[in-house]
Amino acid sequence: MRIGSMVFFALCVITGPTFAQNTENDAGKGHDLATLVCANCHVAAADQRFTPILNPPAPSFESIAQRPDTTAQSLEKFMTTTHRGIDNPGGMPNPYLMDYQVKQITAYILSLRK
């Protein structure tokens, strides 16, 4: 039992910084991807180079991040589901992102929380 606890502790110490780096790295990649893919309709970043084509724009990523019901799971589900249809022709289309891209944009949005 004692050896198992020591191994678990060692793994936590070793993988903790790696997990933090991956999250930061994903957020950085998510920022870059969001300014390419999402900024056409959303204010995805303060440093994006153009104004969204929607008037008014879709919710900003910063405002989405501040919502109390925003979680990694809710963002990932939203980004992989179409919200357009006969009853909602103006809804957000499914951007058809790869799983890793969804995780990167999710990490970026969550990094905007204050």
Which ranges hold each PLM region?
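Positively charged n-region of N-terminal signal peptides that target proteins for export
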Residues: M1-G4
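Electrostatic cytochrome c docking/interface patches
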Residues: G16-L33
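The canonical Cys-X-X-Cys-His
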Residues: T35-A45, I105
